[in-house]
Amino acid sequence: MLFRSGKIINILDTPGHKDLAEDTYRTLTAVDSVILVVDAAKGVEEQTERLMQVCRMRSTPVIIFINKLDRQGKDPFELLDELEDKLDISVHPLTWPINMGSSFKGVYNLQEQNVRLYTPGKTRVEDDDDLLIVSDLADEILDIKLDSDAGKLREDIELIEGVYDDFSADDYLAGITAPVFFGSALNNFGVFELLTTFTGIAPSPGKRETDTRIVEPHEEQFSGFVFKIHANLDPRHRDRIAFLRVCSGRFEKDKPFLHTRSKKDRRFSTPYTFMASRKSIVSEAYPGDVVGLYDRGDLKIGDSLT
């Protein structure tokens, strides 16, 4: 995913169901940061606690998105307490919901000090769409647009600013603090604020530890590992795709790479990159990129190429 800032973010979506937990854990080995999605009504579920334990073990920084604010859910302050209690991490809200359910009005951005108004059923949100710029929380435009919810918003923000210190990106990177965002993923609402912050604070592709040494992303020699294998990804064909995370150097289409387990060279003429259900052939890939490789059964999870 290419952002206007020129940064490329590779997002790996994983299932939240506990029956598919193993697939999620494997994917966590290939990422440098994590976005945990929490249901506003259900709160922190058992599977979320387990995922957080893995993130803590791997020192992976975490951002939390509290979802489904367009439905009735738990009180936002109650959710923050639950996150800290069950996930054992300090949290810091960077956006704040204005009511919820059928009365959901939008979110207040504590960093930018603006309000994004919510329009039910609208799924396309631009960076300046429905954005309400306010001079401060005393701005009368809040009373005009939010009606009685303006007073509650002022009280909530005053409480938040009194409880929480300034947000520290260093604490986020160290896994000490998790920034929290609110919204509705189904309506693509509140996601822009999350991703804008994510591109500013998330770590670049990091080093990877192997059995013999630590691989740095700036090394010229190519290296990568298989973290997932998916069979029959295309229902029209009997295919088998191995997903490879590039750790260092440059992956190139048709170039021979050593499969370290078999000690044999492998070439890949149709390496793919994926965007949801769409896929396209790529000629090269760099550290942090994920490439799909057609596999005849020779590759296994954990295999390395160099």
Which residue stretches match the model-derived regions?
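Structural and coupling elements of P-loop NTPases
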Residues: 1-306
